[in-house]
């Protein structure tokens, strides 16, 4: 078998991604920075009435002290075109940017302003990169170790540190040479022809695509510590985390969505999170500058996502790059989270020294095991016994076992593609073994798979969408799957309703809490259940899940341009209860369902056929 893998592919990919102008800086979507130089412009606003300044702006921060409101407009993944509208105090402006032949063009257009409202163009060297900056009238020069970048601003108002211009008319900024507003506008319009447009490419799901593409594109940023482009869940999560934070299953799902039309970012994110693997052999719950959850992982979805990315793009180097780490992680689950053939979530104590972080609160405790589940405060785990000797929940977890079996099968297929026949067999056998144990969690009387208390041997009736995950791995037969849908999915006392699926059954005492994983709707749950439904002859359920997920996403996307972290299961609102970021990328999985339903994504239930 031919193997052209060199081991340099990932570095070469990042070298291509991390260059040129874009909104690379985490702290503000109004900052435009050139890589690798690190020279950039931070656009700020001054309120003419109060003299207050908006120094940083992020999408979805209406409830923060600064209270800016941003409508995220079209944006290419590489930042060659960006557009947004910003409202703050009495200022309402549109900001457009374009990059052509590595030159930056910015156009700031007032929509509604008052007298003395101003734009401040503040140049700087980002991330402590070396360079000298000088300002002369309406021009800025950035002398870096790579090149000298010249910027020109229409209008006057120079100070020693920045350029302040009135917003009573449009402001044009260009690099390379001075240009008029009309010339910059011409460049903007030229670049605008390259923006992703759901209406032309994804005609059956245009706004689902636009929501997904924009939340991914606007949350793509630069990690200066590791010199990489990544797509974290939300900039709002990253700012207090030191500039970036990666969560395990969130990042894999982002990579899956990105694989639709940005192969490079899909690869980059799948590699980034997988390469955060710990010395113990698991991909951690979360990682950020100086912090990594060394006690716990998160729901395993990595091999499945990598398999699907490969199915879309057929480049084996990605499989070679990630296979060994995915295999270590796969074996880690069986070696460290198995209790009598069942899998349960846990947390491994370790000495984290004198440096304290809030995520350390759960180490070696039930809280940490709940965090490993990814369902932090789910009522499923309220009354679970936590074994302080092995540091695991004493609960056979239907959702975890299903996801793990799916990982075993996915990684087995990848092993087959790579010609690793012994490992392929190992993984196939492991999947079969856990599938047999999962079958024992079927409750014939109740018509659903149920978590089981491993102390008492009793089933738990705290019902969550995770109990439908066995559909993912075809453990139920058609009759069982039909019962699951009829008796539980379509049961209005449990999961059915105008908005679905609540993270705990509607008749559960915790449903009324409407707080995080206690009743609210989460896109990854819908997505995983939808993938499972596709494995069966359940056409109505498949259609209903796609349609209701679409309607839920579009309820807040149309008009608000928000993609929420989670949603109210009664009203479909995303911002009614706190703890729901307004621009969180996995919320777009609600739209990815519809995009997949219309055939724009390779069918995940079909096996890999390329074994050459």
Residue ranges and their predicted role:
Residues 1-204, 208, 535, 573, ...:
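Terminal accessory carbohydrate-recognition/targeting modules of carbohydrate-active enzymes
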Residues 2-41, 45, 298-313, 443-488, ...:
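C-terminal capping/lid segments that line or modulate ligand- or cofactor-binding pockets
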Residues 159-174, 280, 284-301, 307-317, ...:
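The feature captures the catalytic groove of carbohydrate-active enzymes
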Residues 181, 185, 202, 206, ...:
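Generic detection of long, well-ordered alpha-helical segments
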Residues 202-307, 311, 319, 327, ...:
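Substrate-binding groove/exosite segments of carbohydrate-active enzymes
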Residues 216-225, 262-282, 322-341, 430-447, ...:
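Long, well-ordered core segments of solenoidal/helical folds
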Residues 227-237, 498-505, 561-565, 606-608:
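Short coil/turn segments at secondary-structure boundaries
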